[in-house]
Amino acid sequence: MKPIYARYPEVRMRWFDAEAFSARCSDVAMFETESVPAFYYLIDALRDSPLMTEPYFEFVDIIPAVEDGFRDYDAQLAQ
């Protein structure tokens, strides 16, 4: 997986264990980036990798979010 992540250094990833808190999933990956195309390409590369094409993992949900988005929105409205 390291070669895939190395191709997209502008995307940062953090892993969280969730199995004690959720019956829906055992792990959560949080990706952070300012480059939507880099995120898109990284996810496509992961989907094409043995990690996802073999029955090891499956993507359950992809939930896009913007940190402090409401603050940016309010600031934009105030202009």
UniProtKB/Swiss-Prot annotation:
Family indicated by similarity: Belongs to the darcynin family.
Full protein name? Darcynin
Per the UniProt record, the source organism is: Chromobacterium violaceum (strain ATCC 12472 / DSM 30191 / JCM 1249 / CCUG 213 / NBRC 12614 / NCIMB 9131 / NCTC 9757 / MK)
